[in-house]
Amino acid sequence: NKYGTMALSVGLSLYLGWFVPLGVALYWIVSNLFAILQTAVLNRVIDPKKYVDYEALEASRKRLHEIEALQPDRHSAAAKENARREKADYKRFFSIENKHLVFYSEKSGFYKYFKDIIDYIVTHSNVAVHYVTNDPEDQIFEVAKRQPQIHPYYIGQKKTITLFMKMDADVVVMTTPDLDNYYLKRSYVRKDIEYVYVPHGMASQILTIHKGGCDNFDTAFCAGQHHMDELREMEALYGTRKKTLVPTGYCLLDDLIADYESQPHEAHTRPVVLIAPSWQQDNLLDTCIDELIESLLQADCRVVVRPHPEYVKRFKAQAAALKERWAHVDTERLSMEMDFTSNVTIFTADTVVTDWSGIAYEFSFATLKKTLYIDTPMKVSNPDFPQCKTPPFDLDIRKRIGVCLKPEEAGEAGATVRRMLAEAPQSEAELRRIREESVFNVGHAGEVGGRYLLKQLVARAQNAKE
């Protein structure tokens, strides 16, 4: 009977249609309940507290939450607009063939390390400068409006990973170390790209860069002889291939010197002391800042506290607490500076107090004034540095361009600053001599770097013709 068969078929289908989902649901419910029971039993047998540091785990969770809170809302109108820009710029970047020169920057603040080099290139050639940045608000977009040779692209950090994998250019210039060690890889498309590392500071390469951080670059610009010596020693230590080392100098220092010398300088009736620490663990803000401020105020100094931008961003509570603790002091004697866009405070200070921040070199070499160092625990990115025979520049230079105090000696800061200022006239000539010894091509770093890049591009063009 066809109707009976149809009814049986429909009935069986309905039965299975209900039975199978219910069976699967029952399976998952029972298996999950059993897994919970199994975990509870195992936790009683093997106590996880013996193997897991729950306090550290909770601290890491809080830290992760703080970092995530710093990220922009992906669903905001601005984020959606940036996503649209990124997609368009990514497509535009790869639509251009025969790119010769590419600069990569993580954020707007890194433009200052490239500025003089790029200025030389666009002034002395018609080479197009392709500038990739992870910062949608990078100043390069405004610069490019005035200079048509510069072609800027906003590419987010994640998309930069694939951009680097597919990179097609003759020369790539960047300040980011650890090329090919982490997420930024050498091109999978072209094997003949020359990758050039530009240091964003005069600090020691064997201290501040991870082991192997420069190994995968073809060329490294060097601020001073210490960079060349340290890089060569690391090559020998690790048995890596020799890079081309270019004695360029330090572009940012050149700009700071020019800016400082172009400004009028008035003597202060009350010495101005700028406290500008790093943001590493156990920096002077977290170890001896109150004793430091108290001592300087007692010595009748005007104190300006300028925390590192990363410290303010990551440790808002500590920065706010510091500000509140000293709110009772008149701002004519003590002020907290949270605007990091200007160098006016650096230029007008009579001395700088820091721990391991590179601002010391920039201040002392630009103004020819001594720095007061607080010897907080040193930040070491490369634990192998004791194996190097070359003494780290950061350790050697401190006592030459400044005076060092231990954190427990912070109460002596006021008297120390007064003594340093009394000796300032004799210190200027000595600091000028040390600057000339320590930094290559003072006043001409951008020219030297730009000339090298143009020379490499010309050589490649000639080889291509042949």
Model-identified regions with their sequence ranges:
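Active-site and donor-binding regions of nucleotide-sugar-utilizing enzymes
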Residues: 102-257
